[in-house]
Amino acid sequence: MAGVKTFELRTKSKEQLESQLVELKQELATLKVQKLQRPSLPRIHTVRKNIARVLTVINLNQRENVRAFYAGKKYIPKDLRAKKTRALRRKLTKFEASQETEKARKQRIAFPQRKFAIKA
């Protein structure tokens, strides 16, 4: 098995991916044993990268499923939330920023902004 293509992995089911992962890990184990007799085995590199690709696709699928589960819910796990910056995460929402105290509301109503007309 040469390089595994990621676009091919994305079409496979979870069971197929897990079985392929087991096969790749077994192949890696045999290659590690062969390395003792014959050093400088470049095949180990490709097998390790293939294992990483399979694991990446499995993790992406899991995160996608969890994201779909929490879609529309009030609370979302922190690792699925938008990263943003610390300051942006703490920023007031539009609704919170528009709130005003009762005293400020009464003052705004009692003393509206004056409108001036200019003589032409």
UniProtKB/Swiss-Prot annotation:
- According to the UniProt entry, where is the signal peptide? none
Which terms under GO biological process does the entry name? maturation of LSU-rRNA from tricistronic rRNA transcript (SSU-rRNA, 5.8S rRNA, LSU-rRNA); translation
Q: Major location, coarse class?
A: cytoplasm
A single Gene Ontology molecular function, please? mRNA binding
One Gene Ontology term, aspect cellular component: preribosome
Q: Enumerate the subcellular locations listed in this protein's record, separating them with semicolons.
A: Cytoplasm
Q: List UniProt keywords, sorted A-Z.
A: Cytoplasm, Ribonucleoprotein, Ribosomal protein
Task: Tell me yes or no: is Coiled coil among this UniProt entry's keywords.
Answer: no
User: CDD domains per the record?
Assistant: Ribosomal_L29_HIP (cd00427)
Which InterPro entries does its entry note?
A: Ribosomal_uL29, Ribosomal_uL29_euk, Ribosomal_uL29_sf
The similarity annotation says:
Belongs to the universal ribosomal protein uL29 family.
NCBIfam families in the cross-refs: L29
Assembly information from the UniProt record: Component of the large ribosomal subunit. Mature ribosomes consist of a small (40S) and a large (60S) subunit. The 40S subunit contains about 32 different proteins and 1 molecule of RNA (18S). The 60S subunit contains 45 different proteins and 3 molecules of RNA (25S, 5.8S and 5S).
As for what it does, the entry says: Component of the ribosome, a large ribonucleoprotein complex responsible for the synthesis of proteins in the cell. The small ribosomal subunit (SSU) binds messenger RNAs (mRNAs) and translates the encoded message by selecting cognate aminoacyl-transfer RNA (tRNA) molecules. The large subunit (LSU) contains the ribosomal catalytic site termed the peptidyl transferase center (PTC), which catalyzes the formation of peptide bonds, thereby polymerizing the amino acids delivered by tRNAs into a polypeptide chain.
Q: Which PANTHER family match?
A: 60S RIBOSOMAL PROTEIN L35, LARGE RIBOSOMAL SUBUNIT PROTEIN UL29-RELATED
Q: Could you identify this protein by its name?
A: Large ribosomal subunit protein uL29
Q: What species is this protein from?
A: Candida albicans (strain SC5314 / ATCC MYA-2876)
Cite the source lineage: Eukaryota, Fungi, Dikarya, Ascomycota, Saccharomycotina
